[in-house]
Amino acid sequence: LSSQFGIDLSVRDAVDLDSVELPAPRIEPPAALAHRCSADRHERASHTQGKSYRDVVRASYGQLDDPPDLVARPRTEAEVVALLDWASDAGIAMVPYGGGSSVTGGVSCAVVGDFAGVVSMDLTGLDRVVEIDRTSRAARIQGGALGPVLEDQLRPHGLTLRHFPQSFEFSTLGGWLATRAGGHYASVYTHIDDLVESMRVVTPTGVSESRRLPGSGAGPSTDRLFLGSEGAFGVITEAWMRVQDRPVFKASAGVRFAAYDDAVDAVRAISQSALFPVNCRLLDPLEAAMSAGVDDGSALLVLGFESADHPVDAWIERAVELGRDHGGVVPDGIVKSGSATGNATSAPAGTAAGREGAVGAWRNSFVRAPYTRDALVRLSVIVETFETACTWDAFACLHANVIDAVTDAVNRVCGVGMVSCRFTHVYPDGPAPYFTVYAPGRPGSEVAQWDEIKAAASDALLANGGTITHHHSVGRDHDPWYRQQRSAPMGRALAAVKTELDPAGILNPGIIV
């Protein structure tokens, strides 16, 4: 990056938390809840905000101006009810908190409104897989279970939820549901919504629990009301989730394209072929170079298939054939595991398919990306992402205009920088483009610089037919553009729901409504 930017990048020391002054707590919990509440400075500091670029920058400077007064850690649903009753009666804002990985200000305690105080409700104490229905292949899981925690409990049963967002290690089932998180699957099961059988949600006015059903046409869906509500309507305490047998057969390939437009056409053909790959991520030449070590100017399509039931040879071979039909080449071949290899390369024993070559390099980079970003903050490098979805007919214009608008903003604000794009998920009717910005920041001004770039990006997304977010959620950061995207009647309807379920307005104030 130093070479690309033509400047020296020097490491800035992070501020020691012990030197940061936090305002004194304004509230005390009732005696019955005191054992679940803490005013410890490290607890309060770590629950002040999430993990967006601006959050990480502010934390590195010790700018924790709006910590919660208390952090509550309920261990039972009854304690969640008691906390909401207390908050409603005392006029205290209650911010539901899972793993704290929000990148849109969704767990920020800088709430707007006249509240006696703010409590961050950390739900990671509700972390059990309570029940497994092997016949229906479903599991009842508490909302505070972190990704690795729930998978560890499913694994002995030969099952998996198979939902792996980039925040997997530091995010919870309840957080995924509340933000409609995108996960492992690049097609079909792209969002956590698709894996929900039923949900149980505690609201300030009562408990809402939907019936366990494989499908229903009985009016508007209760689950759909709470999915994506981001803690504004209630606290998700548990859910029945559709789980799967652990995959045995896997195959992957990296298809390179000299022309990016040809790569896009290939992805569209694959997405409309009913092959339904679990991985179908297209990296533009810059992203391929930065994340996969592709140094010949090619775009890279990362393909993957998996199954617990049958070999996936025919599926990966047809997808690769479609790539070749559009000018793609496969220098590392097709890598398979758990199946007859045919003319493909077999993955070494004990390894998963797709962990070598450019595909393996991309995978490793994907896993490391959040940690790399946080380290770059100390170099005052602006490195952040934004994402969207659009129809195929709109993509070419959206891609060109967004790249132009963001590049102009980066050059204006930072003097120099880069913007890359990849597809994270694909649908028969359109892709989900995901953009990454790299630029040198001015120490002390990084947040203001990013805010200006982010505004230009968000304006361009909506102006060119995209959504303000495909899977990052609305939070506080996207709220102005979300209000433009949704209709006025829907805004009024959501406000009415908020009034009915949370009449005191204490749940995550300023979110969604």
What role is predicted for each listed range?
Residues 127-281, 346-348, 506:
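FAD-binding subdomain of flavoenzyme oxidoreductases
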Residues 27-28, 38-124, 161:
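Glycine-rich N-terminal segment of FAD-binding domains in flavoprotein oxidoreductases
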Residues 19, 25-61, 245, 251-259, ...:
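C-terminal substrate-recognition/cap domain of FAD-linked oxidoreductases
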Residues 1-32, 83:
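Flexible inter-domain linker/hinge segments
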Residues 69-71, 113-118, 138, 381-389, ...:
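Glycine-rich tight-turn/loop motif centered on a GG-T
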Residues 475-513:
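Activity-critical C-terminal alpha-helical subdomain
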